[in-house]
A protein has these predicted regions:
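Acidic/His- and Gly-rich active-site-bordering loop/insert found
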Residues: 2-115, 121, 130-140
Length: 141
């Protein structure tokens, strides 16, 4: 029996869809519904591959995730990759698709955050997960 192993593209698309399906609308007053949930999703994705992420809240519900990948050369300055999980609120009536469904149409993902910046978050997360699975270390932290 053959086992399906997802490709790197499959993983990026899946992570991006998962993130798009979490409503992380930022209304500017701390009442956004899902930033903490999205951060917990990221924590789980990193923990699943043996990494030790940390979660910090700057305010209730406003969560940030930090993980450090030790580099091969500690003498080199560190490189920071970062993204944000919150999105501008979306009114469903202004959309031809559910803005929080992570729908795929004609090879494109649709949803609030698909281009700012849950797509890049998914790519970074996928690459970091792959590096952890393979035991690869970046050149620098």
């Amino acid at each position: 029996r053959s086992v399906h192993h997802p490709t790197a593209e499959d993983e990026v698309v899946g992570i991006c869809q998962d993130l798009l399906r979490i409503d992380t609308s930022n209304y500017g007053d701390g009442r956004g519904p899902g930033e903490r949930a999205a951060a917990e999703y990221v924590m789980g994705a990193l923990t699943e591959v043996g990494l030790e992420p940390e979660l910090f809240e700057s305010a209730p519900g406003r969560a940030n995730v930090v993980v450090r990948l030790p580099g091969a050369d500690a003498a080199r300055p560190a490189l920071v990759l970062h993204g944000h999980l919150d999105v501008v609120p979306a009114a469903a009536e202004d959309w031809s698709v559910d803005p929080f469904a992570g729908e795929e149409r004609a090879g494109l993902l649709w949803g609030r955050g698909a281009v700012d910046m849950k797509d890049m978050d998914a790519m970074i997360l996928s690459v970091v997960r792959q590096m952890a699975r393979e035991g690869r270390r970046p050149a620098r932290d």
